């Protein structure tokens, strides 16, 4: 009898473990009935046959209730298997309260020798119900644990998110010498997959080979899944290829799922096609894996083909799981109309369906549509969850729609989702993008649980909204909490430090990075950029040279830093070195280098860069087109700038504004006005910047009436409140027209308090037209508003010098010296043979300085002899004798650059020169005479505008 009972228990254990422990995925994927056909129903009576439905159906058909009733009726006569069966039903239905009742009855009913078998069933039931404490208690109290009990406890740990405990129990099982059966391994391999423990997984694989179980179908499935989740797809593929019996769809699903979840789209789809041609018929899980692999626009066609095959199948076309996967596929491929069509055809859409659509709208930048869809969803009575709220709050943030964001925040609080970590992080980001840092801070403080993303988002939010001190304080909190700091936090805090221009803080963060070993290429690139913005090129260069694997961002950061600190020539040289390394410049690098070429007025370099970007396939559109137009304009080649502008297919406000500005720089005011009118005719509405460029053009072309009219149009027609810069242009315009008194009256009648720039423009007009009284007032107001601006002090000093007030000049210069302020030295540069040559006043550092000065003296003597040139020393604003004044004029940087150009270029070649300050009137006369006598066109760009000298005349009309 005992022998029979023992055999019966073993048989029951084998059947139970095979169906419930070893084959859970197989049962789901292949629709194999949970109850084996040979399993005997313990409630069957000889005189009344009963057909017991599967446990899955029992959850809904009342079999559990019926089973309890039968136990109540015939408790004393019920066999052990009846209680085991009811425990199994409790586990399947997660009916833990009924299971506990049954637990109590079992220990009251059965003798101890029969409890071992039922104890294993109790462990299974509690594990299925998620009650690990009860399962552990039953397991620990078992005097004689069977192999089934060990396996069941391992499975309970794995299914309840305790894979480490499962592996620990396995090692205890090995120590106690419990024999291993085939059913032990699937759960253990799943634990290794969850823990990403490739070492333990490989050991289990070796043990399976030793025991001869490695070629069993469901074991191969588990091994494939384990290796794939440990990022060893090659091992998973070797197992799959080496397995001969590929008639099981579950095996194909395992390898397909492995490739799909690892982002191997092409390999997944190739396997799917192979399965379709040679393997078993795909089931719903196969289709979902294939659809998951269709990620992006390039896979849209394949996704449609899979969709077509689904429609042909009457089985899969209506399955919720498949329909949701189809919707997700179309959203990833950017095909939102197709995704919506599937939703309209579904009768069983769930919250996952709605979430997929909302997420799709957000991923495809259709934020407004996402908000409308969510509103319709709620109005139709459908429920949302934390996932949908995360997506829809993100959409409102991208739109900077504060009202919608606050309404969603209230909705979240109402439903109790504000404690959700992802929702909280998204709320922080939304308020950050809406520039509402006070609400962002409150949302952050209200979060019960904060992760690294929470801290990163709030620090980035403060940094992006110019709350740099708050960002630094939070960073210090993160450091104190010893949290793991990632590159996102470091990037945000470094950018905040660069805005504050605090070298002390930057060095402190740099030291923290070095101490924690966080230095990588991304952080090094950020450091180069930050040190450059803090005007410390020494540190920037040192960090840049220490980068081992320099990428395009490294070079771009260094190029940008060099250009920012006035080292445009170095920026051009860095770009050349980058191209020689074989790296291709991106749009950011091209924008930086085009700006550097524009600053240098290096036309040849600019043309080389233009050719480079065309060779690399960059389109002349957007910011690239604007930069190329600006480069040619700043290099004095207005014709090329116009040609590039004409080739731009889609002209927007930025493109029109750049060309209007180009016309203004070259004194072509009428052309600027005509282009502005054309822009308005094309229904492109101007903004503050475009009006500023237009007023600048009118000012330098003497179009006073037009300028006044455009200021009125700006205010009344477009309802744009003028900036101080617009008023500066009008004051400058009036000053150039010798309407200094009217300019002064305009300044006094301004709606807003005049800025230092307005008084500076008025003072410059007074200087040009010798208006002493108004100039005195303007100088006084300028010094009151910006007493420490060296440019303003130099202007005031020059005004005093022209009036012969040398004592006042000395006072101003003494004030500058005491404050440590220095006047920017005048310098000019000229591009020659692909190199930019820079000269300062009376500069003798050039290798050819002897020949240059000889040429300059020769030119000056020829001008004096043939056209009667006499140096106008009244423009020398120093209290020295006449001879010294003549020598000072003779050594001005633009004259040295002209002499070098005459020395190194052939006759009649155009000279292109750039000066960082306004060209003085005597040098202006000198340039006109050189252009006439030597038959040279000279294009000079000074701090105010371009001068085109030709045949003794200048494009500025001697007014600049």
Swiss-Prot record:
Question: What are the boundaries of the region Type E motif?
Answer: 758-833
Q: Which top-level group of life is the source organism from?
A: Eukaryota
User: Listed disulfide bonds for this chain?
Assistant: none
Segments of this protein annotated with the region Type DYW motif: 865-960
Q: Which NCBIfam families match?
A: PPR (TIGR00756)
Name the source organism. Answer: Arabidopsis thaliana
Q: Which GO terms describe its molecular function?
A: mRNA binding; zinc ion binding
Compartments (UniProt record): Plastid, Chloroplast
Gene inactivation phenotype reads:
No visible phenotype under normal growth conditions.
- Segments carrying the region annotation (Type E(+) motif) are 834-864
Residue range of the transit peptide? 1-64
One GO BP: RNA modification
Q: Which InterPro entries match?
A: DYW_dom, E_motif, Eplus_motif, Pentatricopeptide_rpt, PPR_At4g14850-like_plant, TPR-like_helical_dom_sf
What protein name does the entry list? Pentatricopeptide repeat-containing protein At3g63370, chloroplastic
| UniProtKB keywords | Chloroplast, mRNA processing, Plastid, Repeat, Transit peptide
- Primary place of residence? plastid
Q: Does the keyword Signal apply?
A: no
Cellular component terms per the entry's GO annotation: chloroplast
Each PPR repeat occupies one of these ranges, namely 79-109, 115-145, 146-180, 181-215, 216-246, 248-282, 283-317, 319-349, 350-384, 385-419, 420-450, 451-485, 486-516, 520-550, 551-585, 586-620, 621-651, 652-686, 687-717, 723-753
Q: Into which family does the record put it?
A: Belongs to the PPR family. PCMP-H subfamily.
What the protein does comes down to: Involved in RNA editing event in chloroplasts. Required for the editing of a single site in rps14 transcript.
């Amino acid at each position: 009898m005992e022998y029979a009972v023992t055999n019966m228990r073993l048989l029951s254990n084998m059947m139970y473990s095979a169906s419930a422990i070893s084959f859970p995925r197989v049962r789901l994927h292949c629709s194999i009935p949970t109850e084996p056909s040979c399993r005997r129903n313990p409630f069957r009576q000889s005189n009344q046959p009963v057909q017991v439905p599967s446990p899955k159906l029992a959850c809904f058909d009342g079999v559990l209730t019926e089973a309890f009733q039968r136990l109540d009726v015939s408790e004393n006569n019920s066999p052990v298997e009846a209680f085991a069966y009811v425990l199994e039903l409790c586990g399947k239905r997660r009916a833990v309260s009924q299971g506990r009742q049954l637990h109590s009855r079992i220990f009251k009913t059965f003798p101890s020798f029969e409890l071992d078998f039922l104890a294993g069933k109790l462990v299974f039931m509690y594990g299925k119900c998620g009650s690990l404490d009860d399962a552990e208690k039953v397991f620990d109290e078992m005097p004689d644990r069977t192999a089934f009990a060990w396996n069941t406890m391992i499975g309970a740990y794995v299914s309840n998110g305790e894979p480490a405990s499962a592996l620990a129990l396995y090692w205890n099982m090995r120590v106690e010498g419990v024999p291993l059966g085939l059913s032990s391994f699937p759960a253990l391999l799943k634990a290794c997959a969850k823990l990403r423990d490739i070492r333990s997984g490989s050991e289990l694989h070796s043990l399976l080979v030793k025991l001869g179980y490695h070629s069993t179908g469901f074991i191969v499935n588990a091994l494939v899944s384990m290796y794939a989740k440990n990022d060893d797809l090659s091992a998973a593929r070797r197992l799959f290829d080496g397995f001969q019996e590929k008639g099981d769809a579950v095996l194909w699903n395992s390898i397909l799922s492995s490739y799909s979840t690892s982002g191997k789209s092409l390999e997944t789809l190739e396997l799917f096609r192979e399965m379709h041609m040679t393997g078993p018929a795909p089931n719903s899980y196969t289709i979902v894996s294939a659809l998951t692999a269709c990620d992006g626009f390039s896979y849209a066609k394949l996704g449609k083909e899979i969709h077509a095959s689904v429609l042909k199948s009457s089985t899969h076309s209506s399955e919720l799981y498949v329909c949701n996967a189809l919707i997700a596929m179309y959203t990833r491929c950017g095909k939102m109309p197709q995704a919506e069509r599937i939703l309209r055809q579904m009768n069983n859409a769930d919250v996952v369906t709605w979430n997929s659509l909302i997420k799709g709208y957000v991923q495809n930048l259709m934020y407004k549509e996402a908000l409308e869809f969510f509103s319709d969803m709620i109005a139709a009575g459908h429920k949302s969850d934390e996932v949908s709220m995360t997506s829809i709050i993100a959409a409102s943030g991208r739109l900077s729609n504060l009202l919608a964001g606050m309404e969603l925040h209230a909705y979240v609080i109402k439903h109790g989702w504000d404690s959700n970590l992802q929702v909280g992080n998204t709320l922080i980001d939304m308020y950050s993008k809406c520039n509402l840092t006070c609400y962002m801070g409150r949302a952050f403080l209200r979060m019960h649980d904060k992760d690294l993303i929470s801290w990163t988002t709030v620090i980035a939010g403060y940094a992006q909204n110019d709350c740099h001190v708050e960002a630094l304080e939070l960073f210090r909190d993160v450091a104190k909490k010893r949290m793991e700091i990632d590159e996102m936090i470091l990037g945000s805090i470094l950018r905040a430090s660069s805005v504050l221009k605090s070298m002390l803080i930057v060095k402190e963060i740099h030291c923290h990075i070095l101490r924690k070993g966080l230095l990588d290429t991304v952080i090094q690139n950020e450091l180069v950029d930050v040190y450059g913005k803090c005007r410390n090129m020494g540190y920037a260069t040192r960090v840049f040279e220490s980068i081992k694997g320099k990428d395009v961002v490294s070079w771009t950061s260094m190029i940008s830093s060099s250009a920012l600190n006035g080292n445009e020539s170095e920026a051009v040289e860095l770009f050349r070195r980058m191209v020689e390394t074989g790296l291709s410049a991106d749009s950011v690098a091209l924008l930086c280098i085009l700006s550097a070429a524009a600053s240098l007025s290096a036309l040849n370099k600019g043309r080389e860069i233009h050719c480079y970007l065309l060779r690399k396939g960059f389109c002349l559109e957007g910011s690239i087109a604007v930069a190329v137009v600006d480069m040619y304009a700043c290099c004095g080649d207005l014709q090329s700038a116009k040609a590039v502008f004409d080739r731009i297919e889609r002209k927007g406000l930025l493109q029109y504004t750049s060309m209007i500005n180009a016309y203004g720089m070259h004194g072509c005011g009428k052309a600027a006005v005509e282009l502005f009118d054309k822009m308005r005719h094309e229904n492109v509405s101007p903004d503050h910047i475009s009006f500023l460029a237009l007023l600048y053009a009118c000012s330098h072309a003497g179009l006073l009436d037009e300028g006044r009219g455009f200021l009125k149009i700006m205010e009344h027609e477009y309802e744009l409140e003028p900036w101080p810069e617009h008023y500066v242009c009008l004051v400058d315009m009036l000053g150039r027209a010798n309407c200094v008194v009217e300019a002064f009256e305009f300044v006094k009648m301004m709606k807003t308090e005049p800025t230092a720039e307005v008084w500076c423009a008025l003072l410059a007009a007074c200087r040009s037209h010798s208006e002493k009284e108004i100039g005195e007032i303007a100088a006084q107001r300028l010094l009151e508003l910006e007493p420490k601006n060296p440019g303003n002090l130099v202007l005031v000093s020059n005004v005093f010098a022209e009036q012969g007030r040398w004592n006042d000049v000395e006072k101003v210069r003494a004030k500058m010296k005491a404050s440590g302020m220095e006047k920017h030295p005048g310098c000019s540069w000229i591009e020659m043979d692909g190199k930019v040559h820079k000269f300062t006043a009376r500069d003798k550092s050039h290798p050819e300085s002897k020949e240059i000065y000889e040429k300059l003296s020769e030119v000056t003597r020829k001008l004096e002899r043939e056209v009667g040139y006499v140096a106008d020393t009244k423009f020398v604003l120093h209290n020295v004798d006449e001879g010294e004044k003549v020598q000072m004029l003779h050594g001005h940087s633009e004259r040295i650059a002209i002499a070098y150009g005459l020395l190194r270029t052939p006759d009649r070649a155009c000279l292109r020169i750039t000066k960082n300050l306004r060209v003085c009137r005597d040098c202006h006369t000198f340039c006109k005479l050189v252009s006439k006598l030597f038959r040279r066109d000279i294009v000079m760009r000074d701090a105010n505008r371009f001068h085109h000298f030709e045949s003794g005349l200048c494009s500025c009309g001697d007014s600049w």
